[in-house]
Amino acid sequence: MPNWGGGKKCGVCQKTVYFAEEVQCEGNSFHKSCFLCMVCKKNLDSTTVAVHGEEIYCKSCYGKKYGPKGYGYGQGAGTLSTDKGESLGIKHEEAPGHRPTTNPNASKFAQKIGGSERCPRCSQAVYAAEKVIGAGKSWHKACFRCAKCGKGLESTTLADKDGEIYCKGCYAKNFGPKGFGFGQGAGALVHSE
C-alpha cells in the first residue's frame, strides 16, 4: 500500500502516526494509545516493553508466552502458585502440625509469636494499632498514664519503678531524695525532722 501522506504507519492499527502521538520501539512507530500489551492491554513504556517479532508485550505476559516452560518457570518473582507438580510425579510429605512450647520460661520472642503482648496495667492484649512502648513494655494508649496522678505520658516523659510508670513530678515526690530542700520544687525550702 503506498504511503501518500508521508507519515509512518502504526505497528498495531496501520494508520498514520503523527509526531505528537508517536512512540518508537525497535524501529517501528506506534500511537501512544496503541502502545499496549497484546495480551493484557496494559500501557507500555521503554522499561516495560518486550518485543517478539512485530508484537509487543509487557514483560510479564512475554515471560508467560515465550519464557522457559516447566515446573517453577514462567510465573516471575513474587508470584504464588498452587501447582505442586503432582502431574510430574513429585510427591510431597505432610509437615507435622505445630505444637506450642511446654517450657514455662519461654523466650520473649516465643511469647510474642504465641500471642499478643499483654498490657502491664490492665493485663489485656495489646495490638499494634493501640500500642505504646515505655519502660521496656507494651501498653495501651489509654493505660499509658502516671500510676499516681493519671497524667498522660510519653516515652520521653516517664520514670519507672517496680514495673509501674510515673510522671517525673510524681516520681520525684514519691521516690526522689528526701530531706532539707528536696521535693517541693524550685525555690522552696522545707525542714523535715
Swiss-Prot record:
Signal sequence region: none
Main location: nucleus
Domain of life (superkingdom): Eukaryota
GO molecular function, one term: structural constituent of muscle
Protein location: Nucleus
Domain LIM zinc-binding as annotated: residue spans: 10-61, 119-170
Post-translational modification Phosphoserine, affected residues: S81, S192
Gene3D superfamilies, sorted: Cysteine Rich Protein
An example Gene Ontology biological process: muscle tissue development
UniProt keyword annotations, A-Z: Acetylation, Isopeptide bond, LIM domain, Metal-binding, Nucleus, Phosphoprotein, Repeat, Ubl conjugation, Zinc
Modified residues (N6-acetyllysine): K84, K112, K131, K137, K161
Cross-link named Glycyl lysine isopeptide (Lys-Gly) (interchain with G-Cter in SUMO2), sites: K91
PROSITE patterns: LIM_DOMAIN_1 (PS00478), LIM_DOMAIN_2 (PS50023)
Motif interval(s): Nuclear localization signal: 64-69
GO-annotated cellular components: cytoplasm; extracellular exosome; focal adhesion; nucleus; Z disc
UniProt xrefs under PANTHER family: CYSTEINE AND GLYCINE-RICH PROTEIN 1, RHO-GTPASE-ACTIVATING PROTEIN LRG1
Function: Could play a role in neuronal development.
Subunit structure and binding partners: Interacts with ASCC1; ASCC2 and TRIP4.
Name of the protein: Cysteine and glycine-rich protein 1
Organism: Homo sapiens
